[in-house]
């Protein structure tokens, strides 16, 4: 459909359809507000999908229109018989054809890259809000994160709660919590809150509050996080007392056997790791930790703290800065990200499809976590991750939620009842459960 007239007709037609679809969506939203039953909810979902599909098609046709107009302009230009663009510096034509023109006007190179954030400014901003609005926003961006991001992609949203307000000249005004929901092309400012940065900073500042309210991201729920955190103090204490395969202490003659035994334990390896971390501090993160210590936040100062694993309950995409200098914490997050990759690999392996389709269902949480955490100024100790995997890997895999299928006999019975009922009320072919 290269003809401009045809494309314009399609754009007009789709715009008309979109107006009707949006009106139907509004009607469906009103119906759900009045009577939120399953039928109205499914109708609302269908209307949302229709609007989304029409918007995508309309955007595609507008893109085609822009390309066609651009091509037409290019066609009217006098062409160089050599096929070289007028402003190309090559004397002879390249073997490559000319591609798209990339407009970089919107990019600000003074801003830091996506992997860098101003954690101190972000932390001070978040700590300035009341705990209820912070935890409710965390719930919306973790437990209900996928839905929230999908509905608000490409916008800067505001969370509002009655507990969050400010007095201006005696007038009480809501104090909104702003979070940006970027698309893949968005450029984020260093102090700008995104869902990933918000989860990271809040998980690091308020793990005790998260633990008390049992707020958990679905991706952590399916790898058995609830099982893992049960009896955490006893679990980590036992782990610390076990012999570490990476330590070979230099024992002087006459050293008591009890002391020799202690020097071989995981606890000693963690103490050595803590010494390394103490020498690698970044000034901004130290400033944030000091600021947080003066207020309500409950950041763990030791991996044996009861709330330590809850730092990762909402699946932050890196180790939170407030506990990055606690030995074993960054590696614990890496252990969870490997478990997520392991579960996704198991799920991809059991699905039907080509090898390429299965490969698409695999994930790389670990690589992403590693890259983001190391961008904050520390190197992860792979040996600690290995110790975690040796200690807890098998039992965690046994507690994965793999969406197990129905019992074959139960499925057969349910299907026969469906078939029978459909035949009674209709001449249509019954669907499979």
From Swiss-Prot:
Encapsidates the genome protecting it from nucleases. The encapsidated genomic RNA is termed the nucleocapsid (NC) and serves as template for transcription and replication. The nucleocapsid has a left-handed helical structure. As a trimer, specifically binds and acts as a chaperone to unwind the panhandle structure formed by the viral RNA (vRNA) termini. Involved in the transcription and replication initiation of vRNA by mediating primer annealing. Plays a role in cap snatching by sequestering capped RNAs in P bodies for use by the viral RdRp during transcription initiation. Residues 175-217 are annotated as: Viral RNA-binding. Residues 1-79, 100-120, 330-405 are annotated as: Homomultimerization. One of its GO terms (cellular component) is host cell perinuclear region of cytoplasm. Its EC number is 3.1.-.-. It is found in: Virion; Host cytoplasm, Host perinuclear region; Host Golgi apparatus, Host cis-Golgi network. Keywords: Capsid protein, Chaperone, Coiled coil, Endonuclease, Helical capsid protein, Host cytoplasm, Host Golgi apparatus, Hydrolase, Nuclease, Ribonucleoprotein, RNA-binding, Viral nucleoprotein, Virion. Residues 68-78 have a biased composition (Basic and acidic residues). Belongs to the hantavirus nucleocapsid protein family. Residues 1-175 are annotated as: Viral panhandle binding. This is Nucleoprotein. A motif (YxxL) lies at residues 178-181. Gene3D superfamilies: 1.20.58.90. The N-terminus is required for chaperone activity and, in trimeric form, this region likely serves in high affinity vRNA panhandle recognition. The N-terminus also contains a coiled coil region, which probably participates in but is insufficient to initiate N trimerization. The YxxL motif is indispensable for the interaction with host MAP1LC3B. The central region is involved in specific RNA-binding. Has distinct cap- and RNA-binding sites so it can bind simultaneously both the vRNA and mRNA cap. One of its GO terms (molecular function) is RNA binding. Residues 4-71 form a coiled coil. Its main location: virion. Residues 1-50 are annotated as: RdRP binding. It comes from the Viruses. Residues 150-175 are annotated as: Interaction with host RPS19. Homotrimer. Homomultimer. Homomultimerizes and binds to viral genomic RNA to form the nucleocapsid. Interacts with host MAP1LC3B; this interaction participates to the protection of Gn from virus-triggered autophagy. Interacts with host SNAP29; this interaction participates to the protection of glycoprotein N from virus-triggered autophagy. Interacts (via N-terminus) with host RPS19; this interaction probably mediates the loading of the 40S ribosomal subunit on viral capped mRNA during N-mediated translation initiation. Interacts with the viral RdRp. Interacts with host SUMO1 (via N-terminus). Residues 188-191 are annotated as: Interaction with host UBE2I/UBC9. It is an enzyme of class 3 (hydrolase). Residues 377-433 are annotated as: Interaction with host DAXX.
